[in-house]
């Protein structure tokens, strides 16, 4: 049974803060609360929690016996991406042929003290207009500007997220910092700057920067980008599969870009 959460005491924030997916959900709660129609939380069975945020659905702690209810709920909402734990993900993949399973790796950022020399080229408070231009070049399915700007500026104002750029050509975002656990996302470089080592230098600096504050930082990578993060020395923390809706005509709804992958 899936039921919407409308009161704060109904949301198990302790559970959310125990996993990376849960922390992402908790960060959305901290940013938006329970009042916005595009950010809705639900209970799943006795102990599960589900978040629908724009075109992404996140689920933690759901039981396999909830798969029928979840598949019906997913068909009703038609999110672009669904993230949940095994074995529920595998069961949903069988029930939802309109979705494909994509392999995703979680990398832990590794600090490199030599990266401090590039800090002079890092913009700590860049123009969000400039950031969007970089992201557009890297993510053709990026949501439209107004939606992205509204969400990003809101999360930055509330201290949930922080955006950086490097040499006006590469960008990355701290998606959340919860209990010293940091998720980095929205990593992109302008086409004309690719191959110059900007992303490599910038991410090594970001790893070093966060380590100064005793933060454990990770980022997600689908297989198409996985080799790059191995090459720069980031460590595989875990791997999983996520569900994504197969190709359709509604490109604007594709990819909330909540993690850049």
Each language-model region and where it sits:
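Conserved catalytic-core motifs of GNAT/GCN5-like acyltransferases
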Residues: 99-110, 235-254, 258
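Conserved acetyl-CoA-binding loop-helix of GNAT-fold acetyltransferases
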Residues: 65-73, 189, 195-210, 231
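A short beta-loop-alpha structural element at the N-terminal edge
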Residues: 1-13, 118-133
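N-terminal charged segments
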Residues: 1-94, 140-147, 164, 258-261
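Conserved active-site alpha-helix within GNAT-family acetyltransferase domains
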Residues: 87-100, 200, 223-240
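Non-catalytic substrate-recognition and accessory regions of acyl/acetyltransferase enzymes
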Residues: 84-86, 100-114, 125-128, 133-142, ...
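A conserved beta-strand-loop-helix scaffold within acyl/acetyltransferase catalytic domains
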Residues: 53-54, 143-188
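Conserved GNAT acetyl-CoA-binding A-motif
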Residues: 76-86, 210-222
């Amino acid at each position: 049974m899936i039921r919407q959460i409308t009161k704060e005491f109904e949301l198990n924030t302790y559970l959310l803060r125990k996993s990376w997916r849960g922390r992402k959900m908790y960060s959305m709660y901290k940013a938006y609360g329970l009042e916005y129609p595009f950010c809705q939380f639900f209970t799943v069975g006795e102990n599960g929690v589900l978040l629908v945020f724009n075109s992404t659905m996140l689920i933690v702690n759901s039981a396999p016996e909830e798969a029928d209810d979840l598949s019906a709920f997913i068909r009703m909402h038609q999110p672009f991406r669904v993230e949940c734990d095994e074995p529920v993900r595998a069961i949903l993949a069988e029930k939802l042929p309109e979705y494909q399973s994509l392999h995703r790796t979680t990398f832990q950022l590794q600090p490199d003290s030599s990266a401090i020399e590039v800090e002079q080229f890092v913009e700590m408070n860049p123009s969000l207009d400039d950031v969007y231009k970089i992201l557009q070049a890297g993510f053709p399915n990026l949501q439209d500007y107004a939606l992205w700007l509204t969400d990003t500026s809101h999360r930055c104002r509330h201290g949930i997220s922080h955006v950086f750029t490097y040499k006006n050509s590469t960008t990355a975002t701290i998606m959340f910092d919860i209990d010293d656990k940091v998720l980095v996302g929205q990593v992109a470089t302008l086409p004309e700057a690719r191959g110059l080592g900007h992303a490599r230098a910038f991410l090594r600096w970001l790893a070093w920067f966060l380590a100064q504050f005793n933060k454990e930082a990770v980022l997600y990578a689908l297989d198409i980008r996985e080799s790059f993060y191995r090459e720069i020395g980031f460590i595989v923390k875990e791997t999983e599969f996520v569900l994504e809706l197969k190709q359709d005509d509604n490109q604007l709804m594709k990819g909330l870009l909540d993690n850049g992958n």
